[in-house]
């Protein structure tokens, strides 16, 4: 397929997709904010900051010219940290054209507005129809995508034809893409799992075993599902790639920034110390605040998220997190608030 794709953001994920898609024959433009990074990538075919051991194919058009990047394609994929998405969307909004499709690769919930990434894009790209905006999520560490390892993603958009178009654009022999029209479910699953990854990492750092991690993952998925249903998501989405798939890889993998951050907290480091030494953003820290606020807004009980919030922002001991979760009142395993019990 000869689709042209513009990737806004030359972090790990933007770089990995540029490398992978270009190797598969796509016409790829990669926009980076800093001129010096662009110059390094053009001359050395390496990203100086992210995935620096991976060669960027010469066919990738690297630029810091926003207008040139926007004009190179009618399919834009925005791969910037979630809390920076709005500022980038504001800049590209005047450059949209009829037929442009914009896909968010960022996973998160905006702190100030509690909007998902597609909602942020819809806010800023006001002239676009809702069906032109989607997301591409799933269990996908950038390192493995850049190395051409088998990976699966889900393209979510309000209409199936638009989601299928994104699917076709990104599908390669080693990148298999599925379609879903439950955009909010895909976004909540793909964003809230970062909170659970921090919880899993805290358990690793404290020294808890596989039983505890399995409990955190499964009970964490249950509370993500409750929140998603309250926001209009379809329950089955959380059994898919953006639900259990993304949750498993993020909670288990040594590549996971959020799991690593949690592990260091479990080892006794402070959040400030960890963030100062990390080169990359751990989205789960900011998402923890947003998800807790969403849970309170929708009156949804999310005990694992609340426990992570107390450790991150209220100076609670990591050891107390599991103790508090284990001594909660008895519950049914499959439980929903009364107003959601008819949802299947």
Curated annotation (Swiss-Prot):
Active site, renumbered: 193 (proton acceptor)
GO biological process, one term: carbohydrate metabolic process
Record-stated family: Belongs to the NAD-dependent glycerol-3-phosphate dehydrogenase family.
UniProt name for this protein: Glycerol-3-phosphate dehydrogenase [NAD(P)+] 2
Record organism: Salinibacter ruber (strain DSM 13855 / M31)
Binding site for NADPH: 12-13, 33-34, 107, 142, 257, 281, 283
Function: Catalyzes the reduction of the glycolytic intermediate dihydroxyacetone phosphate (DHAP) to sn-glycerol 3-phosphate (G3P), the key precursor for phospholipid synthesis.
Binding site for sn-glycerol 3-phosphate: 107, 138, 140, 193, 246, 256-258
Catalytic reaction(s) noted: sn-glycerol 3-phosphate + NAD(+) = dihydroxyacetone phosphate + NADH + H(+); sn-glycerol 3-phosphate + NADP(+) = dihydroxyacetone phosphate + NADPH + H(+)
